[in-house]
Amino acid sequence: MIQSQTLLNVADNSGARKLMCIRIVGASNQRYAHIGDVIVAVIKEAKPTSALKRSEVIKAVIVRTCKEFKCDDGMIIRYDDNAAVVINKDRNPVGTRIFGAIPLELHQNFDKIVSLAREVI
């Protein structure tokens, strides 16, 4: 579960390395974000040569959480880290590669992210 002020790793090659969640998009009173939710985040750490710079406000989609996630088929998945993928206004990923495992449930809303991922669970 991701809430405000949570630090996340970035699971793509957009240039950002660490994000901090500042808002959950979608509901005004929603406290926690889960896998597949869109968040507003600020870049806390970035590669020096990237187009994305530190303290930029961006949107990202959650792809991995430490909290258990129950799949549609009943399987329970837990990851080692909290991670997100940076997206643009059209909800397409900014990066061209996705690192790490991605759940298949993202296919419903973020088909492009699932197609870029090497590991889909």
Swiss-Prot record:
InterPro entries named in the record: Ribosomal_uL14, Ribosomal_uL14_bac-type, Ribosomal_uL14_CS, Ribosomal_uL14_sf
Keywords tagged on the record: Chloroplast, Plastid, Ribonucleoprotein, Ribosomal protein, RNA-binding, rRNA-binding
PROSITE patterns from the UniProt entry: RIBOSOMAL_L14
Gene3D superfamilies, sorted: Ribosomal protein L14
GO cellular component: chloroplast; cytosolic large ribosomal subunit
Biological processes, Gene Ontology terms: translation
GO MF entries: large ribosomal subunit rRNA binding; structural constituent of ribosome
First-listed, main subcellular location of the protein, grouped into a coarse class: plastid
Role of this protein: Binds to 23S rRNA.
Family: Belongs to the universal ribosomal protein uL14 family.
Protein name per UniProt: Large ribosomal subunit protein uL14c
Source species: Pelargonium hortorum (Common geranium)
